[in-house]
Design a protein with these regions (language model features):
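Short gly/ser-rich loop at a beta-strand->alpha-helix junction or flexible surface loop bordering the NTP-binding
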Residues: 1-179, 203-205, 212-215
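A short, surface-exposed helix-loop junction/capping segment
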Residues: 179-190
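Active-site metal-binding core of divalent-cation-utilizing nuclease and nuclease-like domains
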Residues: 104-106, 212-235
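A mid-sequence, solvent-exposed acidic-amphipathic segment
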Residues: 188, 192, 196-224
Length: 235
């Protein structure tokens, strides 16, 4: 069965079942990163969810920026959206900001405030909004999100030009921070060759099943003059 889904922004499970898909198909598509369950009984294609989430969250960031006091830097999932990194809806259910201070954060209905040290080099401007740098954003996500989500964001950041050296320097500054062990594990697992969110998620799933790390974008050569698409090679 082809996995090209002829669907609008949102499609109910019953509609997909009527088109010939079964529950196993939907689970495989969800695990592979092609489908996202936006709520019980409703799905959307992953890239469409990304677009919907980004547009909605950018509006929230703008509205929040007009009301925040000075010193609040957009961070975590909010910074990921501003940098163009893939995010899951739950990662941006609230607008995330970090203030340069130690101590516990504050979670409100719309805004979650994190308290953590912030160096000047860890703050950039995107569309005139103060946002944590790409390095700091990836590390904050790696400390706080499930590994599949953190790896998907980190792989994209490497593709955008972020280096492992930058991530390593950032990790040194986070010694003893909550979640830093998980962040180190995520950083070690990142692969610039990953070409999609689904590919990043699949690598994590393979690792969690105890399978060897795949060789990405492996060129399969045949005796025939036919070009085969690049893919995984499991050792």
């Amino acid at each position: 069965m082809s996995w090209a889904l002829p669907m609008d922004d949102i499609r109910l499970t019953r509609s997909l079942l009527e088109q010939g898909y079964n529950y196993g198909d939907l689970r495989r598509l969800e695990r592979g990163g092609e489908l996202v369950r936006v709520r019980r009984g409703a799905y959307a294609r992953a890239h469409e969810v990304d677009q919907m989430v980004e547009k909605r969250h950018r509006r929230l960031v703008l509205a929040t920026a007009l009301q925040l006091r000075d010193g609040a830097i957009f961070s975590h999932g909010s910074a990921a959206v501003m940098h163009g990194l893939p995010v899951w809806p739950e990662a941006v259910a609230r607008v995330h900001v970090t203030r340069n201070r130690r101590g516990s954060g504050i979670k409100r209905s719309v805004v979650q405030v994190h308290g953590a040290p912030l160096l000047p080099a860890e703050i950039v401007l995107i569309d005139n909004f103060p946002v944590t740098s790409l390095t700091r954003t990836v590390l904050d996500l790696a400390r706080t999100l499930p590994m599949t989500q953190a790896v998907a964001a980190g792989d994209r950041a490497l593709a955008l030009g972020l280096s492992r050296k930058q991530l390593g320097v950032g990790l040194l500054a986070m010694e003893r921070w909550p979640g830093v062990r998980t962040a180190r594990r995520v950083v070690e697992f990142l692969d610039v060759r990953s070409e999609s969110v689904g590919e990043s998620m699949s690598r994590v799933c393979l690792m969690e099943e105890g399978l060897p790390r795949p060789d990405l974008q492996y060129d399969l050569r045949t005796r025939r003059p036919t070009r085969c698409p690049r893919g995984f090679l499991l050792g």
